[in-house]
Each structure stands twice: as C-alpha cells, then as structure tokens.
Amino acid sequence: MNSKKIIVDILLFILMIIEYSRLYINPTVHEIIGIGLIILIIFHIYLNRNYFKRIKKGKYNFKRSFKLVINITFLIVFILTCIFGILSSQFLSIGSLTTIYLHKIFAYLSVLLLGLHLSTNINPLMAKISYKKIIFPIFIIFGIYSLIQVDFWNHLTGRYGFSITTGNILINSIYYIGIVLMIIALLNLDKLTQKN
C-alpha cells in the first residue's frame, strides 16, 4: 500500500471517530470536519479507483461478494450521512428535526459499516497478529462495554441526540474505536485457530 493511501486512510479514521464526539466540539468545527471527510473520501475513492475497475472482472466467491456488498453499502450510507448533514447545517437553515435525526442514524450505522469495511480490507493482517486468543477477546469485551457506555442502540435508532456520554473527547473517541475493533475481532474469529 502506498504512503498516500495510508495517510488518507488514517486521517479518514481519525476524523470520523472525532465526529462522534459531537457533544464536545463546536458545531462549526463539526461541520468543517464533515467537509474534510467528504474531501478525503473522494480522494480515497480516487486512490482506490482500480478496485472499482475490477468489480466486473473475475469470479466471485462468498468472501469477495461480502466485501463488495460491505464497501458499496458503506459508500451509500456515508453519502446519505453527508447529504443529511449538509441539509442539517446551521448555516443553511433548510433542515428539520427529521434531517438531523436521519443524519445521526446514518452516522451511527456508519460506525458498524466502518468496522466491517476495515475487517474485510485488512483481513490478511489479522492472521499475523500475535496473541490473538488474548487480544481478540479483549477487543470484544471492551467493544461491548463501549456500546453500553455510549448507549449505541438508542443513538442508532434515533431515540437520543448525538451523545449523552460523560467524560471528554478522548474517552468518547476511545469508546468508538473500541466498537470498531470489536467488529474487526468478531469477523476474524476464524484466525484464532491459525498459526502466525
């Protein structure tokens, strides 16, 4: 993987996680980061354009089909998150409570899809991780704890605003990273029986 892809992917991950600390950042900063995410995702797609060119080529097994479904679904949900985010902008005054909640619901759905997307794309690396039998259970347990701490289900179903967690932006971000790591671990449980 080239350095540009790595830098863009890391920035995407960091900014996306920060966005879930909506309670702890200025609304204007939240929107600026959102614009940054849109720019980065366009760049990300451009850097991975060869993947899209190969979609119609070759045979599809379950793993490749699953990866394609996750990637396309994640892209669609991300676009919807951006659309409703723009409609909900404090500077446009064209949104409503409905657009705000749809923005939030798609945003929280994106967390789950982010975990699935990363899992399908870094799958080969999982087999190389040492002490998987210790690390994966820790990821899963902490991920479940994080889901509870941020009351993820009620956010996903639109029952609450963007965040009701207490603490600070760092703690809140760690919780969401924990959720992503949990999903990655769950989708790579088969690696526990493989030797490094």
Regions found by a protein language model. Name each.
Residues 1-196:
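Membrane-embedded alpha-helical bundles that constitute the cytochrome b-like, heme-associated redox core
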